[in-house]
Structures are given as structure tokens and as C-alpha cells.
């Protein structure tokens, strides 16, 4: 049984490092699930401590031995308590999350920003773009707006559209657009491509729902705070992905490129469409499940893709 974080704990903990160590120990003991921006107990405890103390994320190690007021320790312990007993993701406790080097507002209107696509954005999508002249890009299923806004931030000469079916998600994305001065980003309400008639792009990027029904039902409690609309995607996790593959060519230039995240549904997609030349991205951080595919490749196999999508 996890040790309760009683007010008495504040008497035994004195420094920033003390609190970080204590939080990490309690999180590990409680068997928390990590993966919402941070993948381990120590990083989560660090983020909560720095947030509660109004300190920057790049705080130098010299401050680790700074002694805290009792009221400060109690604020930190209250956050630890909620993380352990309620299983609230850290980003929803702090109200923000880092993605591609940018700090986004985060709350239950959209999934917590997290995707290996951040690495691609910061690498300029090379070598996958292969020098293409991108003028107009789309982030399909934008959620909090993190991918669209990060694309616009690192490519100020691009026009970037961010689309989503959820008005709640779009309201959060708008707040992030204002927060990060993303003047070259336009947010659009759209059910996949339905609201994007007549718009064409050189690059489409998407992190759509791709979690199978069975996996969604079995997800740890932390994921229950996120909108299910951003997770659940049918028996094999590919309900929306197949529609994207079917309809993307109508919105891509002839030399256009689609980059899409499918997570653990990668194997199922390859089994369904072995003839399609998906280029699977290898990440420095060891993640998987993101492919790049040429528009011409989708056109060449459109009939097969359309038949599979029609079965959904």
C-alpha cells in the first residue's frame, strides 16, 4: 500500500532535491503510468516541484539544496497527492506541456501534447521532404494545436492549417495560437477533410486517433482524463487512418507528402496494405509508428485503400 503524503512529511523534507526524490519514490511505489510528456517518475516529480515553486524548467543544480518554506512544501505535496490518488496526468495538474521546445497550455479539452513527430518538426522533416518547397501545410486532427503551431514556429514562411472535429480542442488550440504568437497558423473545424474543400497542400501531417477499442477500454486511469475522441479508433485502430489515406491525395499536390502517426497499429496497417511503400521513420528517441508516404503512392493504390475504408 502506498504511503500517504501526510502533512507530517513536510517536517522531514527540507530542500528541492528532497521533494523531488520523495515524489519520485511515491510515484514509483504507487505504480503510476507515465507517458504524458514524461516517461519516468523522477521527471514527473521534478516538473511538479518546479511548477509549484514557480521556478523555470532549466533551473540550475545549485538551487537543488535550497530550503523551502512549509507552505511551499505543502503546495508540492498536495500536487503529489493528486497525482497518486487521482492519477491526474502531470500536464493537467500544471496546465501546460512542452512539445518541440515550445510550452503549450494543456487541459482536458485535448490530449496532452506528445508525439515523436516533434523530432521531425525540429529536423525540418528531412530527409523526408527531400527539399520540397512547402508553402501550405496541414496538421489534421490538431487537438491542442501543438503540431500545427510547432510547424509554423519553425517554418515562419509556411502557411499552416490545423483542423479538428472537436470545438473544445479547437478552443484550446486557439489559446495556444495566441500564447505562442502563431500568426501563420489557421484553425479550421473539419471532420477529417470535409471542411477543407478546395485546399491543397505540399505536406499533410497527422497524429489521428489510432488506439484499438480493446486497448482503449484497458488503458490506465491516467488516460481516462483525456477525450476518448482523440484515442479510440475501432477494432484495429485504423478506422480514421484509412480514411486519411483514401482522401489525402485530393488535398495534396502531385509531389505532396503525407506523414502520419499510427503507433502500435503499424503492424496491422502493413498487413492490410503490404503493397503500399510506407517509409517508417526511425527516431533518435527510439519511438516508432510514424510513416511517410508519397501522394503518388496513395493514388496508385487508391482502389484497395478505398475498399478497406468503406468497410469501416
From Swiss-Prot:
Enzymatic reactions: L-glutaminyl-[ribosomal protein uL3] + S-adenosyl-L-methionine = N(5)-methyl-L-glutaminyl-[ribosomal protein uL3] + S-adenosyl-L-homocysteine + H(+)
Gene Ontology BP terms: methylation
Cellular component, GO annotation: cytosol
Chain coiled-coil ranges: none
One Pfam family matching this protein: MTS
CDD domains referenced in this protein's UniProt entry, alphabetically: AdoMet_MTases
Keyword Methyltransferase found: yes
MF-aspect GO terms: nucleic acid binding; protein-glutamine N-methyltransferase activity
EC assignment: 2.1.1.298
SUPFAM superfamilies attached to this UniProt entry: S-adenosyl-L-methionine-dependent methyltransferases (SSF53335)
Keywords: Methyltransferase, S-adenosyl-L-methionine, Transferase
Gene3D superfamilies with a match to the protein in the record: DNA helicase RuvA subunit, C-terminal domain, Vaccinia Virus protein VP39
NCBIfam families: hemK_fam, L3_gln_methyl
Family label: Belongs to the protein N5-glutamine methyltransferase family. PrmB subfamily.
HAMAP family according to UniProt: L3_methyltr_PrmB (MF_02125)
Function: Methylates large ribosomal subunit protein uL3 on a specific glutamine residue.
UniProt protein name: Ribosomal protein uL3 glutamine methyltransferase
Protein species of origin: Xylella fastidiosa (strain Temecula1 / ATCC 700964)
